[in-house]
């Protein structure tokens, strides 16, 4: 009986210590996976970094759990893209608005979820009425702003700058974060340089993708994104015919995530995931896919 009592007491004490350690652990939140790698490169292991949208889930259908909402209010800081619908709705309910960091601040945004574009030499699969997805629009669109800034090496540099500025304000005495930030920026500049070099050497003018997730990437390097999907809607038969015909004429060799169309034009079907955690490695992989002959 005595041994049993001692065991229960020790177990309870250990449980209390674990709960206290969890409560004392400093936590940052990010809205999507690519932001965890970006912020993590700056803060290292000093914080636990929680991600709102789990791997494999869609930001478009995301609903936070009660546990996540409690965690957000307890978090030291919350980093978000600032352009995704659920972020606006959810983070407006946070009690301490000052700890919410909009990482897209200062980036020249592109209006709309553009579905098609012109190539420099010809109107690529647009039927003559396409809207460029690689150039900013000065007019408003009912479908808002393209949120995929994290797929752009140059936008990532600005996002890293915004993240570091917020971290420095909160923790001004940590020289380690400055060192980490400078190393991250060097990596992002190198990413930009090698991406631009690969695209220039490839001579490509445009690429075809199902969902327009690489709009900012295309703008960075002066190429065109021809997206099959229009504003989140399935493409019409006419649209598919236009894309297939133009792709055949131009000898397109691969389609990013649309198996049926790739089969119709005898091209390779390649799946890409813009929400992969390691943003730098993901952009390298996407560039290799786009430029590979």
Model regions: which residues?
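Sec-dependent bacterial lipoprotein signal peptides
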Residues: 1-15
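Extracytoplasmic metal-acquisition and chelation regions
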Residues: 17-293
């Amino acid at each position: 009986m005595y041994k049993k009592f001692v065991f229960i007491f020790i177990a309870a004490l250990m449980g209390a210590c674990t709960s206290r350690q969890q409560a004392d652990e400093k936590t940052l939140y990010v809205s999507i996976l690519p932001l965890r790698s970006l912020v993590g490169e700056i803060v290292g292991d000093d914080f636990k970094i929680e991600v709102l949208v789990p791997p494999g889930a869609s930001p478009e259908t995301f609903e936070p759990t009660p546990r996540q909402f409690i965690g957000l209010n307890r978090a030291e800081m919350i980093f978000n893209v600032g352009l995704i619908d659920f972020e606006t709705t959810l983070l407006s309910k946070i009690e301490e608005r000052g700890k919410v960091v909009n990482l897209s601040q200062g980036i020249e945004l592109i209006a709309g979820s553009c579905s098609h574009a012109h190539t420099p030499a010809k109107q690529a699969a647009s039927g003559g009425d396409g809207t460029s997805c690689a150039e900013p629009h000065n007019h408003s669109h009912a479908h808002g702003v393209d949120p995929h800034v994290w797929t752009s090496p140059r936008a990532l540099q600005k996002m890293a700058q915004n993240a570091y500025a917020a971290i420095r304000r909160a923790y001004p005495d940590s020289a380690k974060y400055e060192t980490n930030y400078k190393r991250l920026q060097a990596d992002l500049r190198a990413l930009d340089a090698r991406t631009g070099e690969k695209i220039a050497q490839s001579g490509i003018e445009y690429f075809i993708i199902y969902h327009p997730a690489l709009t900012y990437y295309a703008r960075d390097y002066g190429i065109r994104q021809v997206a099959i999907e229009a504003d989140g809607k399935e493409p019409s038969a006419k649209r598919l015919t236009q894309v297939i015909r133009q792709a055949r004429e131009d000898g397109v060799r691969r389609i990013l995530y649309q198996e049926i169309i790739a089969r119709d034009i005898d091209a390779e079907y390649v799946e890409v995931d813009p929400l992969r955690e390691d943003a730098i490695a993901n952009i390298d992989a996407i560039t290799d896919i786009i430029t590979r002959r």
